Every structure is written in C-alpha cells, then in structure tokens.
Amino acid sequence: MEEQVLPELDVAELELQAVIGFNGHVPNGLKCHPDQEHLIYPLGCTVLIQAINTNEQNFLHGHGNNVSCVTISKEGDYIASGQVTFMGFKADIILWDFKKRELIARLSLHKGKIEALAFSPNDLYLVSLGGPDDGSVVVWSIAKRDAICGSPAAGLNVGNATSVVFSRCRDEMFVTAGNGTIRVWELDLPNRKIWPTECQTGQMKRIVLSTGMADDDSFFYLGTTTGDILKMNPKTKLLADTGPVKDKFSLGVSALRCLKMGGLLVGSGAGLLIFCKSPSYKPIKKVQLQGGITSITLRGEGHQFFVGTEESHIYRVNFTDFKETLIATCHFEAVQDIVFPFGTAELFATCAKKDIRVWHTMSKRELLRITVPNMTCHGIDFMRDGKSIISAWDDGKIRAFAPESGRLMYTINSAHRIGVTAIATTSDCKRIISGGGEGEVRVWQVGCQTQKLEEALKEHKSSVSCIRVKKNNEECVTASTDGTCIIWDLVRLRRNQMILANTLFQCVCYHPEEFQIITSGTDRKIAYWEVFDGSVIRELEGSLSGSINGMDITQEGGHFVTGGHDHLVKVWDYNEGEVTHVGVGHSGNIMAMRISPGNQYIVSVSADGAILRWKYPFAS
C-alpha cells in the first residue's frame, strides 16, 4: 500500500458523489452518533458519516493507510480514528470535529497499528491501545491535544491487549483486555501515571474479543473466543459469574453491548445476534444474520440498534420484535469488474468473490445479488439486448444469468483450463469472446438453446486481461499479461496484428473512430497504437507509483479515464495527452472503471470492496 500522492495543484479535482462500501472487518467499526441521525464507519483510509434518513454522505480524509478503529465521544462532538501502518512506522490517531467535519489534531506515539480507542465519559481524555508491535496504552488530554502518560498494556508473561472500555461514570478508570490479560486502570493525574490492577479469573484462561461496561459501572462484561461471557466487578477486580455453561456461542463472542434496562446484546462470529441476561446467558431473543458480527451500536437507549458484519452488511434491528432489516451492503472482497448495460446509466453491475451484484446508480441500492459459493467472478458483460449477464469465473466456466431474476440461464463448462479471466460480447448478441488464464482466446456461438465453440485462438502465452470488440463485430482486441496485444479478425478467425511492449498489459480501449487503440499496464505508461500496422503513436506517463488496472474512453473519444495502484482516478484529454481532473478517494488499488453511457458519471471499483461514483467533469 503506497501512501497517497496528492496531485499537483493545477489539476482540477473530480467531484465524488457517492460511495458504496463498508469495512466490516474493523472491530466495533460501525457507530451510531448520539444525535441518532448519523452512522459513522470506516472504509479503507476514509471515515464515512452517513445520514440515516437521507443517506447523505460526508467523508473524513486524512489517514495515509487503512483505518483500524473508530470511536465517538459521549456527547458526539468528537470522533477519533486510528490506522495501521508499516512495521516500525508511527501510526496516527486523528481527532475530528463532528459538526465541522474537519481534522482537529493528529496524535502520534504508537507504532504499527492502533488496536482500540475510547473516550472518557466527560470527554476529558482519550485512551488508545497500540497493536502487537507496540503493546502500550496511552492516555491523551483532549483539551491539550497531547499525551498525559503511557504504560505497557499487558504484563510480560501474557498476550496482547486488544480491546479497551472506559468507565461510564468516572473519567479516571478504564479497562483493557486481550489474550490472557484483564486489567483495570486508574489514572493518577497529578503524578501523570496510570496504575494497573490485574483481574483474577482463577483457573480460567480466556482470550477476550469484546468488552462492555454497565451503565452504573457496577460490572463489566467480556466476550471471549471460547464463546462464553465473563462478568467482572471493577471494584473488587473479581469474577462475578460466567456463562453460558452449555451451548456456547459459536466462533466466539465478537461483539457485546450492555443495555440500560439490563441484559446484554451479544453478537457471535457465526452471525447469531442474541439478547440474554446474567447469570444464565441463555438466549431470550435471537436472530441469524449473514457474516460474523463485528459491531453492535445502539440508537438512543437501545430501542433500535445497528449491527455490522464481516460480510459488509449493515442491519437495523428493532428491539421489540427483534427482526432485522438490511439497510446497506457492499462487496467484502476486491471488486473485479464493473459494467453498464447498453445505453443506460440508471444501473450497473459489479462482480467479486462469490457474487455478482446489480446496483441502482442514484440511490446506491442493491437491486440483485447472484451468488456462486466459493468462486470468484473475474469479468462481466451485459448482452446488448439486455436479456442476460455473461460472467467469467475462476472455475473455468462461463455463466449467463437473467438480469431481473438472477436465474441461471446457461453454463458453458470447461470454457478455459485455468479459469476464465476476461469476457466480451458482440452487439448482435450471437457471440461471446472469452479469454483464459492459459492465454487462449475462444469465440463462442450462442443461440437460444445451444452454445458452441467456434474457434480457439492460441497466440497469447499468458492470461488474457482485457477484451474489447469493434462496433461492427468484425474485429476485436485482446490484452495479455505476456506483453502482447493482439487484434483478431472475427470473420476469418485469425490474427490481424500484434503489438509488443515490455509490460504486463492490464487494459485496452478502442478509440471510437476505431483506427487507434490505447493500452496500459504495469509499466505505468499509456500507449496509443495504430490498429492498421500495430505501430506506436505515442506514450504518456500514466502514473508515478504503480500499475494502471482500469481504463475507459468516452463515446465521442475526446477524453478517457484511468485508475490503478496509485488509488487516483485520472481524466485525460485524448488529443493533448494531459490530465485534466484527478479524483482522490480510493484507499485500495483501483481494479476497474467505466464512464456511464451519456457521460454523466465515472464509476470506479477497488480492491477494498469499495464502489465510488464521480461526477463526469465535462458537459456532454
């Protein structure tokens, strides 16, 4: 992960309109603001603030790497977020002003990673926990924006502390817990020291995943990897009770919340959400969700709450009927491809591990999900008539689905030996051109009932990364990671022209007038080529720091867009070869991008599962 290199100032900025994404792997990453109107959650190196009712989004940019924890002060004035960084480098904590949506202070002491953060009940202090390479706990003064004191978080002969919870009534007491360690800390402000007391659990050895403090500080609760809950008394530092004795929570207690009315909300690693009470901890109410639960956050007193899972689902649950409503979802693995149907910008499809999803462009809603378990989809295309979605899968099959229902229409088995890596369709809807991991390009004839292999074109020596078809369906171009682009004659089914370069080609586009193509790849250069004889016209320096993975050109051919490992979306003038606009917002490597039909939006997708929609900067 390179740090983001901000572009020079003379280039205009692209306007980011919307983000579809949520990093569900961050423990307690989903937070409901005390005003009960906003959700706050991390995505890559940004923190998103989303209005619950209107879905309006604000973005907090400032971290140079992935956000690893987020917390909100009791009154809701401050947000604090911590990040991961490279081994030996300092990891920043950023303090944000919620109302102004801006950075107040950057606190850096910890190395490698910030494991957890917590505000004191009167917003006086912030306590932070460093990652495994750091192992320290630090108390910060919010007024002075400076560290008060620090200490090693755990003893010498136990594991790392991974979670921290502040007292609900006193600003001087907090609890840290982790692998074999549970400590209650007292802050001694005059001497600038924190004093730990080790809590005794007797013969029991547990790894703590989640913590929760009762409203009156009478007890705190610890969820463990074993799947049981420990109830501790912070005054006596002794174990009060533990449970459930039988039927422990599968895959551990990964999230825990205490309710004002008594009782606990418990989320397990297997996706089970439970309401239970001490000392039996037997389920009083329960509901099964999709993906291991990583966050439970209350809206107000807990009459309604939000749950975030590892599979990047955000659910709203009402306490009384304990029924879940899915309010937001996105891909939880790298998004491989994005495509618009012919002639409409109202919806688009993306594909990733396990599934293909169809989205409504304006409302960011998921309209359809097509799931194929344990497989990864490398590429998708809509047939021109809109009657099927053609997809390329890593098990070597080409699958076609109905776009309204998601029903499997047909499968082409064993289409390629080492997985299907690229796919394209002709505008007459009669042919599919596919590329495989072994380098073959295959032309398939598709009828109502039959799918027949017309020709296998064997020229490439390595996987095919991109296929584009000419408007008249008589020619196509394929880009490969063996350093060649080949222009094929689709009538006589043989090679017309070959382009060689010292790079792994990742993307290729026809200029709309179709006498030139542009290519790019791992050498960071954008090259213009003559289709007729395969000669290079010119080369541009496409990026400063990494491979270019995605490219698309407008219908008129005046501008094109690129994106890649530098996390920047760039808009280029085709004839001048100059960057006109740059979009900063991605925090993972950009995998693919498309300009919508009608040139309204640019949609880019990245390796952290995010889908970003940008306003196209020129009037069409």
From Swiss-Prot:
Gene3D superfamilies attached to this UniProt entry = YVTN repeat-like/Quinoprotein amine dehydrogenase (2.130.10.10)
Pfam families assigned: WD40
Repeat as a keyword of this entry, yes or no, is yes
Q: What GO CC terms are in its UniProt record?
A: axonemal B tubule inner sheath; axonemal microtubule; sperm flagellum; sperm midpiece
Q: Which GO terms describe its biological process?
A: establishment of left/right asymmetry; flagellated sperm motility; gene expression; microtubule sliding; single fertilization; spermatid development; spermatogenesis
The entry's localization annotation reads: Cytoplasm; Cytoplasm, Cytoskeleton, Cilium axoneme; Cytoplasm, Cytoskeleton, Flagellum axoneme
**InterPro entries in UniProt:** WD40/YVTN_repeat-like_dom_sf, WD40_repeat_CS, WD40_repeat_dom_sf, WD40_rpt, WD_repeat_EMAP
For whether the record's keyword set contains Cytoplasm, the answer is yes
Question: What are the protein's UniProt keywords?
Answer: Cell projection, Cilium, Cytoplasm, Cytoskeleton, Flagellum, Repeat, WD repeat
Q: Which PROSITE patterns match?
A: WD_REPEATS_1, WD_REPEATS_2, WD_REPEATS_REGION
**Record-stated family:** Belongs to the CFAP52 family.
**According to its UniProt entry, what is the function of this protein?**
Microtubule inner protein (MIP) part of the dynein-decorated doublet microtubules (DMTs) in cilia axoneme. Important for proper ciliary and flagellar beating. May act in cooperation with CFAP45 and axonemal dynein subunit DNAH11. May play a role in cell growth and/or survival.
Protein name as annotated: Cilia- and flagella-associated protein 52
Highest lineage ranks of the organism?
Answer: Eukaryota, Metazoa, Chordata, Craniata, Vertebrata
- Which gene is this protein's source? Cfap52
